[in-house]
Amino acid sequence: MMPEIGNGLLCLALGIALLLSVYPLWGVARGDARMMASSRLFAWLLFMSVAGAFLVLVNAFVVNDFTVTYVASNSNTQLPVWYRVAATWGAHEGSLLLWVLLMSGWTFAVAIFSQRIPLDIVARVLAIMGMVSVGFLLFILFTSNPFSRTLPNFPIEGRDLNPLLQDPGLIFHPPLLYMGYVGFSVAFAFAIASLLSGRLDSTYARFTRPWTLAAWIFLTLGIVLGSAWAYYELGWGGWWFWDPVENASFMPWLVGTALMHSLAVTEQRASFKAWTLLLAISAFSLCLLGTFLVRSGVLVSVHAFASDPARGMFILAFMVLVIGGSLLLFAARGHKVRSRVNNALWSRESLLLANNVLLVAAMLVVLLGTLLPLVHKQLGLGSISIGEPFFNTMFTWLMVPFALLLGVGPLVRWGRDRPRKIRNLLIIAFISTLVLSLLLPWLFESKIVAMTVLGLAMACWIAVLAIAEAALRISRGTKTTFSYWGMVAAHLGLAVTIVGIAFSQNYSVERDVRMKSGDSVDIHEYRFTFRDVKEVTGPNWRGGVATIGVTRDGKPETVLYAEKRYYNTAGSMMTEAAIDGGITRDLYAALGEELENGAWAVRLYYKPFVRWIWAGGLMMALGGLLCLFDPRYRKRVNPQKTALEAA
């Protein structure tokens, strides 16, 4: 009975989403305030109905209702209860329901926190978000219903959740990533509303920027957590593999970063209007593209879900409709919001525009590297592979000018400035950068690698100028805002991430060895000694745990416990890496296959500064959070001066 209630709630949600898509827009056309205000009620009803359906599915997992096909395929009675809850979004149907839940949640949030925004804007934005919900609800109900039954011949035991997903990462990574994906729908809806009305000014940016910041924060956290999860779970010792689905999350992050900076220019200088709208459309369009890549089954990825052609065609059609319609609208009405401001070459606006172009170029590189093998194969031209060397080389060339401009940008004034005003500061920063980028590799690794020096030069340039500019502001008693300190934190976070990448990419040591009890291997300054392997049993798995002692200069450093697990129901073997993490290095061991004479295949790593990559990501997210506290976003705006008046 409960699954039928869940299905009924989804049908109800579809009806409400249709009303939300049409009725408020009718009110805008008629100038009827009550009809426009109904958008908030519909948003609340939509969220409640989808949340109800989602809770029904969670309950089905918790009580092991194997009459539901989705539950029977992704859970069993031996699975710990917290993984049963997380299994709700662990596969195709449930993850789509999570998407719709978060979509309705963002819609409801806009309805709640838009009391200071003119009613006609709210009606347009919520209606557009309702249209997106309609598309996904139709997709769920007709191709991916999570409440489909196994009746009358239901199994007494489920197949189990994919062992790769039986990790705390599943609890947090998909919701955070989807919060970012779906959050960009708010900026998208504001952009479409602006194009429909044909007017845009700095008020638009004030409305849109906090929502874009929130989405960007969630997406940043999702990417950081996903990278850390891959690092410790897959046993490869890597933090980024340029996997197509990793790229699918990275592309909207790049464009979203450009969008945040472009919104700052639109808010401060009423410039870059059409460019800002195009970025808002592109960010959400790339989120839809990522969904298509994961759900359609057109690519090979450790993240991709097996899917039938009907699902892929539905998503493709929906994606073409949304993206194509949005771009056509932009082509037809973009000229109505075009800026008439001429920016000086040496101004903050121009430097931000240059960095925006570099971010978009980086996105296009990732897009090309992701889709070209797919297109090449579909055209019958054979299989090609675009791997890490291509991406790393292209990003290096793009990031050097990006870092250069990023360091200088905050020092330059809006409108027009003179380079000579900051000449002395730039000279000091250049000398400091040169010294640090040569000294740090020698201090920590006793050798200098050219690519490490280049990476550290970018990081030090950004960090030195950010700290110097902040110190100057404090010494002069200049007023600072939350947005300013958020910018400083985010830029320093990027510098920290670059340091982590530079060291881990160029100084990591990897050894694949054959070890038995008593064998030792030296890596860097550490000696790894294989002690023994003992049997161990978990709630739904059994396996062995290897004990590996680590010493440094003859003194005990740590003990690593690397596991090999066999999951009973799934019938699959998994590696659980052992990691001893530190501020400046990680020691990493992964247990491979058992060999003859009591020996085991073991993979050992020395990873310097790898945790700085994720620490920098967290600092960037913190910077975004500080920007959200800026009081400008809580001021009421005069409806007569809004950027989005009724057409």
Where are these regions (language model features)?
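Membrane-interface interhelical loops and short amphipathic "cap" helices
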Residues: 1-9, 32-36, 59-93, 145-174, ...
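Contiguous transmembrane helix-bundle modules in multi-pass membrane proteins
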Residues: 1-34, 45-52, 66, 244-252, ...
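A conserved hydrophobic secondary-structure block that centers on an alpha-helix together
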Residues: 11-22, 28, 95-227, 235
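Membrane-interface helix-boundary motifs at transmembrane edges
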Residues: 30-39, 113-125, 197-208, 267-274, ...
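A generic, lipid-embedded transmembrane alpha helix
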Residues: 45-62, 135, 218-225, 286, ...
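Transmembrane-helix bundle segments that line or gate the permeation/cavity pathway
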Residues: 50-73, 77-79, 86-111, 139-149, ...
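Extended, hydrophobic alpha-helical segments in both membrane/secreted and soluble proteins
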Residues: 175, 182-192, 204-262, 275, ...
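Soluble non-transmembrane domains of integral membrane proteins
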Residues: 511-603
